[in-house]
Amino acid sequence: MTVRFGLLGAGRIGKVHAKAVSGNADARLVAVADAFPAAAEAIAGAYGCEVRTIDAIEAAADIDAVVICTPTDTHADLIERFARAGKAIFCEKPIDLDAERVRACLKVVSDTKAKLMVGFNRRFDPHFMAVRKAIDDGRIGEVEMVTITSRDPSAPPVDYIKRSGGIFRDMTIHDFDMARFLLGEEPVSVTATAAVLIDKAIGDAGDYDSVSVILQTASGKQAIISNSRRATYGYDQRIEVHGSKGAVAAENQRPVSIEIATGDGYTRPPLHDFFMTRYTEAYANEIESFIAAIEKGAEIAPSGNDGLAALALADAAVRSVAEKRQISIA
Protein backbone atom coordinates (compact mmCIF):
# COMPACT_ATOMS: atom_id res chain seq x y z
CA MET A 1 0.00 0.00 0.00
CA THR A 2 1.20 3.47 -0.86
CA VAL A 3 0.07 6.14 1.61
CA ARG A 4 -1.16 9.19 -0.27
CA PHE A 5 -0.32 12.48 1.43
CA GLY A 6 -1.60 16.02 1.39
CA LEU A 7 0.74 18.73 2.69
CA LEU A 8 -0.80 21.72 4.46
CA GLY A 9 1.72 24.54 4.53
CA ALA A 10 4.62 25.07 2.13
CA GLY A 11 6.96 27.11 4.30
CA ARG A 12 10.33 26.13 5.72
CA ILE A 13 9.17 23.07 7.66
CA GLY A 14 6.70 22.17 4.91
CA LYS A 15 9.61 21.86 2.50
CA VAL A 16 11.38 19.55 4.94
CA HIS A 17 8.36 17.25 5.17
CA ALA A 18 7.72 17.36 1.43
CA LYS A 19 11.23 15.98 0.93
CA ALA A 20 10.74 13.30 3.60
CA VAL A 21 7.41 12.12 2.19
CA SER A 22 8.62 12.14 -1.41
CA GLY A 23 11.73 10.21 -0.45
CA ASN A 24 9.76 7.33 1.07
CA ALA A 25 9.00 4.39 -1.21
CA ASP A 26 5.72 3.72 0.61
CA ALA A 27 4.42 7.28 0.28
CA ARG A 28 3.31 9.64 -2.44
CA LEU A 29 2.84 13.37 -2.10
CA VAL A 30 -0.42 14.01 -3.96
CA ALA A 31 -1.20 17.63 -3.15
CA VAL A 32 0.00 20.73 -1.34
CA ALA A 33 -1.94 23.73 -0.05
CA ASP A 34 -0.64 27.09 1.12
CA ALA A 35 -2.02 30.59 1.56
CA PHE A 36 0.81 31.79 -0.70
CA PRO A 37 0.35 30.20 -4.15
CA ALA A 38 4.00 30.65 -5.14
CA ALA A 39 5.16 28.60 -2.14
CA ALA A 40 2.77 25.77 -2.98
CA GLU A 41 3.72 25.87 -6.65
CA ALA A 42 7.41 25.60 -5.78
CA ILE A 43 6.80 22.35 -3.89
CA ALA A 44 4.47 21.07 -6.60
CA GLY A 45 7.15 21.71 -9.19
CA ALA A 46 9.85 20.05 -7.13
CA TYR A 47 7.91 16.88 -6.27
CA GLY A 48 5.33 16.50 -9.02
CA CYS A 49 2.23 16.97 -6.89
CA GLU A 50 -0.86 19.13 -7.37
CA VAL A 51 -1.68 22.48 -5.79
CA ARG A 52 -5.07 22.31 -4.09
CA THR A 53 -7.00 24.17 -1.42
CA ILE A 54 -7.25 22.82 2.12
CA ASP A 55 -10.96 22.24 1.53
CA ALA A 56 -10.20 20.18 -1.57
CA ILE A 57 -7.62 18.08 0.28
CA GLU A 58 -10.09 17.52 3.11
CA ALA A 59 -12.73 16.20 0.71
CA ALA A 60 -10.35 14.26 -1.55
CA ALA A 61 -10.77 10.52 -1.93
CA ASP A 62 -7.17 10.21 -3.13
CA ILE A 63 -5.66 11.52 0.14
CA ASP A 64 -5.08 9.11 3.04
CA ALA A 65 -3.05 11.33 5.36
CA VAL A 66 -2.07 14.94 5.88
CA VAL A 67 1.01 16.68 7.21
CA ILE A 68 0.09 19.93 8.97
CA CYS A 69 2.80 22.58 8.69
CA THR A 70 0.63 25.68 8.91
CA PRO A 71 0.94 28.38 11.62
CA THR A 72 0.44 27.11 15.17
CA ASP A 73 -2.87 28.89 15.71
CA THR A 74 -4.42 26.78 12.91
CA HIS A 75 -3.21 23.37 14.08
CA ALA A 76 -6.03 22.33 16.42
CA ASP A 77 -8.80 23.35 14.02
CA LEU A 78 -7.14 21.48 11.16
CA ILE A 79 -6.58 18.38 13.28
CA GLU A 80 -10.28 18.30 14.16
CA ARG A 81 -11.35 18.84 10.56
CA PHE A 82 -9.18 16.08 9.17
CA ALA A 83 -9.98 13.70 12.03
CA ARG A 84 -13.66 14.03 11.16
CA ALA A 85 -12.76 13.58 7.48
CA GLY A 86 -11.20 10.21 8.26
CA LYS A 87 -7.61 11.15 7.42
CA ALA A 88 -4.50 10.13 9.35
CA ILE A 89 -2.82 13.25 10.72
CA PHE A 90 0.77 14.25 11.27
CA CYS A 91 0.98 17.67 12.91
CA GLU A 92 4.03 19.76 13.63
CA LYS A 93 4.43 20.79 17.25
CA PRO A 94 2.71 22.29 19.14
CA ILE A 95 -0.92 21.28 18.72
CA ASP A 96 -1.87 24.62 20.23
CA LEU A 97 -0.45 27.11 22.72
CA ASP A 98 -3.39 26.62 25.10
CA ALA A 99 -3.60 23.35 27.03
CA GLU A 100 -7.40 23.39 27.26
CA ARG A 101 -7.65 23.81 23.51
CA VAL A 102 -5.30 20.85 23.08
CA ARG A 103 -7.46 18.71 25.37
CA ALA A 104 -10.58 19.59 23.40
CA CYS A 105 -8.78 18.75 20.16
CA LEU A 106 -7.56 15.40 21.48
CA LYS A 107 -11.12 14.50 22.50
CA VAL A 108 -12.19 14.90 18.88
CA VAL A 109 -9.26 12.73 17.82
CA SER A 110 -10.29 10.09 20.35
CA ASP A 111 -13.99 10.23 19.45
CA THR A 112 -13.25 9.84 15.74
CA LYS A 113 -10.56 7.20 16.37
CA ALA A 114 -8.22 9.20 14.14
CA LYS A 115 -4.49 8.52 13.99
CA LEU A 116 -2.52 11.56 15.20
CA MET A 117 1.25 11.91 15.43
CA VAL A 118 2.97 15.05 16.76
CA GLY A 119 6.21 16.24 15.19
CA PHE A 120 8.90 15.83 17.82
CA ASN A 121 11.47 14.77 15.26
CA ARG A 122 14.45 14.45 17.61
CA ARG A 123 13.16 11.12 18.92
CA PHE A 124 13.96 9.78 15.46
CA ASP A 125 17.51 11.07 15.14
CA PRO A 126 19.78 7.99 14.80
CA HIS A 127 22.24 9.29 17.41
CA PHE A 128 19.55 10.06 19.98
CA MET A 129 17.84 6.75 19.21
CA ALA A 130 21.15 5.04 19.99
CA VAL A 131 21.23 6.85 23.34
CA ARG A 132 17.74 5.55 24.12
CA LYS A 133 18.74 2.02 23.05
CA ALA A 134 21.75 2.10 25.37
CA ILE A 135 19.37 3.01 28.20
CA ASP A 136 16.83 0.32 27.25
CA ASP A 137 19.59 -2.29 26.99
CA GLY A 138 20.75 -1.50 30.52
CA ARG A 139 24.19 -0.38 29.38
CA ILE A 140 24.35 2.53 31.86
CA GLY A 141 22.17 1.12 34.61
CA GLU A 142 19.36 3.21 36.08
CA VAL A 143 19.06 6.69 34.57
CA GLU A 144 19.89 9.40 37.09
CA MET A 145 20.51 12.62 35.14
CA VAL A 146 19.86 13.84 31.60
CA THR A 147 21.69 16.89 30.24
CA ILE A 148 20.41 18.49 27.04
CA THR A 149 22.13 21.33 25.19
CA SER A 150 20.20 22.96 22.36
CA ARG A 151 21.39 26.24 20.88
CA ASP A 152 20.25 27.81 17.63
CA PRO A 153 22.80 29.51 15.38
CA SER A 154 20.75 32.72 15.44
CA ALA A 155 17.44 34.05 16.67
CA PRO A 156 14.35 33.99 14.45
CA PRO A 157 12.73 37.24 13.32
CA VAL A 158 10.93 39.16 16.06
CA ASP A 159 7.67 38.91 14.13
CA TYR A 160 7.95 35.12 14.42
CA ILE A 161 8.75 35.31 18.13
CA LYS A 162 5.64 37.41 18.78
CA ARG A 163 3.37 34.62 17.53
CA SER A 164 5.49 31.63 18.63
CA GLY A 165 4.25 31.37 22.20
CA GLY A 166 7.73 32.16 23.49
CA ILE A 167 10.97 30.23 23.69
CA PHE A 168 9.70 27.58 26.11
CA ARG A 169 6.73 26.64 23.89
CA ASP A 170 8.61 27.06 20.61
CA MET A 171 12.18 25.87 21.20
CA THR A 172 12.50 24.22 24.61
CA ILE A 173 9.38 22.15 23.95
CA HIS A 174 11.54 19.80 21.83
CA ASP A 175 13.85 19.33 24.81
CA PHE A 176 10.95 18.76 27.18
CA ASP A 177 9.83 15.92 24.93
CA MET A 178 13.36 14.52 24.72
CA ALA A 179 13.74 14.70 28.51
CA ARG A 180 10.54 12.67 28.96
CA PHE A 181 11.73 10.24 26.28
CA LEU A 182 15.02 9.59 28.09
CA LEU A 183 14.13 9.90 31.78
CA GLY A 184 11.61 7.08 31.70
CA GLU A 185 9.53 8.89 34.33
CA GLU A 186 7.29 11.92 34.19
CA PRO A 187 8.70 15.14 35.68
CA VAL A 188 6.80 16.40 38.71
CA SER A 189 8.52 19.77 39.07
CA VAL A 190 10.00 22.47 36.84
CA THR A 191 12.47 25.20 37.77
CA ALA A 192 13.41 27.67 35.05
CA THR A 193 15.46 30.82 34.65
CA ALA A 194 15.49 33.11 31.64
CA ALA A 195 17.24 36.22 30.35
CA VAL A 196 17.62 38.46 27.32
CA LEU A 197 21.33 38.37 26.45
CA ILE A 198 21.28 38.49 22.66
CA ASP A 199 18.69 40.90 21.29
CA LYS A 200 16.79 43.55 23.24
CA ALA A 201 14.00 43.39 20.65
CA ILE A 202 13.25 39.85 21.80
CA GLY A 203 12.74 41.13 25.33
CA ASP A 204 10.60 43.99 24.03
CA ALA A 205 8.42 41.33 22.38
CA GLY A 206 7.90 39.71 25.78
CA ASP A 207 10.23 36.76 25.30
CA TYR A 208 13.70 35.52 26.26
CA ASP A 209 16.65 34.29 24.22
CA SER A 210 18.64 32.41 26.89
CA VAL A 211 17.03 29.90 29.27
CA SER A 212 17.90 27.06 31.63
CA VAL A 213 15.50 24.47 33.05
CA ILE A 214 15.71 21.74 35.68
CA LEU A 215 13.09 18.99 35.61
CA GLN A 216 12.76 16.49 38.45
CA THR A 217 10.78 13.26 38.71
CA ALA A 218 9.16 11.82 41.83
CA SER A 219 12.14 9.48 42.34
CA GLY A 220 14.61 12.37 42.08
CA LYS A 221 15.85 11.88 38.52
CA GLN A 222 16.78 15.18 36.88
CA ALA A 223 16.97 16.67 33.43
CA ILE A 224 18.94 19.86 32.88
CA ILE A 225 18.23 21.85 29.71
CA SER A 226 20.33 24.70 28.32
CA ASN A 227 18.90 26.78 25.45
CA SER A 228 20.23 29.80 23.60
CA ARG A 229 19.10 31.61 20.48
CA ARG A 230 22.75 32.24 19.54
CA ALA A 231 25.59 29.82 18.84
CA THR A 232 28.20 31.48 16.65
CA TYR A 233 29.81 28.10 15.90
CA GLY A 234 26.71 26.40 14.43
CA TYR A 235 23.67 24.38 15.48
CA ASP A 236 24.59 22.98 18.91
CA GLN A 237 22.71 19.75 19.71
CA ARG A 238 24.10 17.50 22.44
CA ILE A 239 22.73 15.01 24.94
CA GLU A 240 24.32 13.15 27.84
CA VAL A 241 22.60 10.62 30.09
CA HIS A 242 24.28 9.64 33.34
CA GLY A 243 23.28 6.38 34.98
CA SER A 244 24.12 4.18 37.94
CA LYS A 245 26.60 2.13 35.87
CA GLY A 246 27.94 4.67 33.40
CA ALA A 247 26.98 7.34 30.91
CA VAL A 248 26.07 7.68 27.25
CA ALA A 249 26.39 10.81 25.13
CA ALA A 250 25.47 11.99 21.64
CA GLU A 251 27.81 14.73 20.48
CA ASN A 252 27.38 17.37 17.80
CA GLN A 253 27.19 16.22 14.21
CA ARG A 254 28.91 17.73 11.18
CA PRO A 255 28.15 17.49 7.47
CA VAL A 256 31.66 16.06 6.99
CA SER A 257 33.40 14.02 9.70
CA ILE A 258 37.07 14.73 9.18
CA GLU A 259 39.80 16.18 11.35
CA ILE A 260 42.92 17.91 9.98
CA ALA A 261 46.11 17.98 12.03
CA THR A 262 48.96 20.37 11.22
CA GLY A 263 51.69 22.13 13.11
CA ASP A 264 49.11 24.76 14.03
CA GLY A 265 46.86 22.22 15.75
CA TYR A 266 43.67 20.32 14.96
CA THR A 267 40.78 21.64 12.90
CA ARG A 268 37.35 20.17 12.15
CA PRO A 269 34.57 21.25 9.77
CA PRO A 270 31.81 23.45 11.20
CA LEU A 271 28.61 22.06 12.67
CA HIS A 272 25.40 21.80 10.67
CA ASP A 273 23.95 25.25 10.11
CA PHE A 274 20.41 24.46 11.36
CA PHE A 275 17.73 21.82 11.86
CA MET A 276 16.96 21.33 8.16
CA THR A 277 20.34 19.67 7.57
CA ARG A 278 21.11 18.40 11.09
CA TYR A 279 17.91 16.36 11.34
CA THR A 280 17.46 15.16 7.75
CA GLU A 281 17.51 11.50 8.81
CA ALA A 282 15.22 12.20 11.75
CA TYR A 283 12.54 13.70 9.52
CA ALA A 284 12.74 10.72 7.17
CA ASN A 285 12.55 8.24 10.07
CA GLU A 286 9.64 10.18 11.55
CA ILE A 287 7.57 9.85 8.38
CA GLU A 288 8.57 6.18 8.16
CA SER A 289 7.17 5.62 11.66
CA PHE A 290 3.96 7.47 10.79
CA ILE A 291 3.47 5.33 7.69
CA ALA A 292 4.03 2.16 9.74
CA ALA A 293 1.29 3.30 12.12
CA ILE A 294 -1.08 3.80 9.19
CA GLU A 295 -0.24 0.61 7.29
CA LYS A 296 0.54 -1.84 10.07
CA GLY A 297 -1.21 -0.43 13.11
CA ALA A 298 2.10 0.26 14.84
CA GLU A 299 2.07 2.43 17.95
CA ILE A 300 1.94 6.14 17.29
CA ALA A 301 4.61 8.05 19.16
CA PRO A 302 4.92 10.89 19.81
CA SER A 303 1.16 10.99 20.33
CA GLY A 304 -1.20 13.84 21.01
CA ASN A 305 -0.81 13.15 24.71
CA ASP A 306 2.96 13.51 24.34
CA GLY A 307 2.32 16.90 22.78
CA LEU A 308 0.10 17.86 25.72
CA ALA A 309 2.68 16.69 28.27
CA ALA A 310 5.45 18.75 26.65
CA LEU A 311 3.19 21.81 26.57
CA ALA A 312 2.42 21.36 30.28
CA LEU A 313 6.15 21.48 31.03
CA ALA A 314 6.54 24.58 28.86
CA ASP A 315 3.65 26.28 30.66
CA ALA A 316 5.22 25.40 34.01
CA ALA A 317 8.56 26.86 32.88
CA VAL A 318 6.84 30.12 31.94
CA ARG A 319 5.26 30.24 35.41
CA SER A 320 8.55 29.38 37.09
CA VAL A 321 10.29 32.34 35.48
CA ALA A 322 7.42 34.71 36.21
CA GLU A 323 7.04 33.61 39.84
CA LYS A 324 10.73 32.90 40.49
CA ARG A 325 10.04 29.52 42.06
CA GLN A 326 9.77 25.81 41.43
CA ILE A 327 6.46 24.77 39.87
CA SER A 328 4.84 21.41 40.63
CA ILE A 329 3.21 19.45 37.81
CA ALA A 330 -0.20 18.04 38.74
UniProtKB/Swiss-Prot annotation:
GO terms for molecular function: inositol 2-dehydrogenase (NAD+) activity; nucleotide binding. Induction: By myo-inositol. Its EC number is 1.1.1.18. It comes from the Bacteria. It catalyses: myo-inositol + NAD(+) = scyllo-inosose + NADH + H(+). One of its GO terms (cellular component) is cytoplasm. Keywords: NAD, Oxidoreductase, Plasmid. Disulfide bonds: none annotated. Pathway: Polyol metabolism; myo-inositol degradation into acetyl-CoA; acetyl-CoA from myo-inositol: step 1/7. Gene3D superfamilies: Dihydrodipicolinate Reductase, domain 2, NAD(P)-binding Rossmann-like Domain. The keyword Transcription does not apply. The keyword RNA-binding does not apply. Pfam families: GFO_IDH_MocA, GFO_IDH_MocA_C3. One of its GO terms (biological process) is NADPH regeneration. Belongs to the Gfo/Idh/MocA family. PANTHER family: BINDING ROSSMANN FOLD OXIDOREDUCTASE, PUTATIVE (AFU_ORTHOLOGUE AFUA_2G10240)-RELATED (PTHR42840:SF3), NAD(P)-BINDING ROSSMANN-FOLD SUPERFAMILY PROTEIN-RELATED (PTHR42840). Involved in the oxidation of myo-inositol (MI) to 2-keto-myo-inositol (2KMI or 2-inosose). This is Inositol 2-dehydrogenase. It comes from Rhizobium meliloti (strain 1021). The gene is idhA.
